Amino acid sequence: MFSNIFSFDRNFYNKGFYPVAGIDEAGRGPLAGPVVAAVVILPKDSAIPYLNDSKQLSEKKREILFEIIKETALDYAVELVNNEIIDEINILQATFLAMSRAVLKLKTQPDLYLIDGNRKVHGLSFNQETIVGGDAKSACIAAASILAKVSRDKMMLEYAKQYPVYEFEKHKGYGTKKHIEALKKHGICPIHRLTFSPVNDIISQTKLNI
């Protein structure tokens, strides 16, 4: 994995694309909190140990790599779109918006953007390549996945202090059994996504019971 993940990006360098940026997001599925996107440009000779898809790493390894990536990257940016905008424009468009905002924060203009998934970022005229499962194939996408994931987790830890009854520190807003039980018991808080099920179901049920 260590060798292959960097070899994947080098294939693009060898075709004349450099620098290359990886884009990924964290937080499309949760019932609460923002969606976060990150974009990362790594040096040609980058060789970060244990770099992989953030979902395949322990929390401790992600946090260590988070700092290494920020120190190693030629450029990077992280942006978010909050739950209110997610409800207004839908999660897919909110994800594109977060990615667009992150791209526009870069000081370095890449020759190519590698995007995790099968959808290009709408509204951007830059050269884009979609990579299904890219966070496990491409070093720069894997790096972006880690920055996005750790950044979002840190935000959710802060929200956990504001809204302790939901225990966001444990599930980061995902729809775990404990989270749904807390929703049913305490209702929603300001960072819940009102258009997501079962949040909207719980809201409807609460209205019926009034």
Swiss-Prot record:
SUPFAM superfamilies xrefs: Ribonuclease H-like (SSF53098)
Keywords: Cytoplasm, Endonuclease, Hydrolase, Manganese, Metal-binding, Nuclease
GO biological process, one term: mismatch repair
GO molecular function annotations of the record: manganese ion binding; RNA binding; RNA-DNA hybrid ribonuclease activity
Protein name (record): Ribonuclease HII
Names of the cofactor(s): Mn(2+); Mg(2+)
InterPro entries: RNase_HII (IPR022898), RNase_HII/HIII (IPR001352), RNase_HII/HIII_dom (IPR024567), RNaseH-like_sf (IPR012337), RNaseH_sf (IPR036397)
Reported function: Endonuclease that specifically degrades the RNA of RNA-DNA hybrids.
Principal cellular location given in the protein's record: cytoplasm
HAMAP family hit by this protein: RNase_HII_B
Family: Belongs to the RNase HII family.
EC class (word): hydrolase
Residues binding a divalent metal cation, per UniProt: 24-25, 116
GO CC terms in record: cytoplasm; ribonuclease H2 complex
EC number: 3.1.26.4
Cofactor remark: Manganese or magnesium. Binds 1 divalent metal ion per monomer in the absence of substrate. May bind a second metal ion after substrate binding.
Domain RNase H type-2: 18-208
Location within or outside the cell: Cytoplasm
Flavoprotein keyword on record: no
Keyword Cell membrane attached: no
Catalytic reaction equation(s): Endonucleolytic cleavage to 5'-phosphomonoester
